[in-house]
Amino acid sequence: MEEGSRSQSPREELELSMLDGPQEELTPLNNDLRIQPNSAEDPSPAQVGKESPWSPCNKSVVGKCKLWMVIVTIFLCFIIVIVISLCLVGVTYIDEDENEILELSSNKTFFITLKIPEECANEEGLHHLLTERLTDTYRQSPSLSRFFTSADILDFSVENATVTYHLQFGVPSEDDDFMKYMMSEELVLGIMRQSFHDKNISTCESLGLDPESLLLYE
């Protein structure tokens, strides 16, 4: 009984007073304390700092049209315009040299002699094939087609196995530069040699392949 009625120590009284203090201090004012939930749409400061550098391109310009769509469309239109311009330039380009009208008031004559290989010397109709080849070669030549007139047989010798042709071209009068560059023996003979190298005559495949078998003179 003495122990139960013993008065409490000062320390115990202090602890009890702290526990039994006014509860008003623990209650929020006006009971307005609310927990604000984090919205998924509101980016956190860390997310804002890590925003993609391409995010401005995803902004809407008109309706659902994004900025990147506008940029890509402009770029494609620019490429299409360039391609169309290049096509039009290629179609409408006019070569002034091809359309230049020259007054071909003079004639230029060459004689070309072809040595026929022995295995083809007795081939019938060979001279006709050669005439067609010479005519087609110069008529289809980009350099001399405008000036070529004719190719005629001048001599056909079975004994010597040679055939000589008379080549005639129309040329401008008194044009030294034209005669020097466009009607040179090297050019006329070179076109013929190239023709034999590109395509042989079926009945005489070795004809014209030997450089010594072609002779051109005026």
UniProtKB/Swiss-Prot annotation:
It comes from the Eukaryota. It is found in: Endoplasmic reticulum membrane. Keywords: Endoplasmic reticulum, Membrane, Transmembrane, Transmembrane helix. One of its GO terms (cellular component) is endoplasmic reticulum membrane. Residues 1-54 are annotated as: Disordered. It is a single-pass type I membrane protein. Its main location: endoplasmic reticulum. The chain crosses the membrane at residues 66-86. PANTHER family: TPA-INDUCED TRANSMEMBRANE PROTEIN (PTHR14636:SF1). This is TPA-induced transmembrane protein homolog. The lineage of its organism: Eukaryota, Metazoa, Chordata, Craniata, Vertebrata.
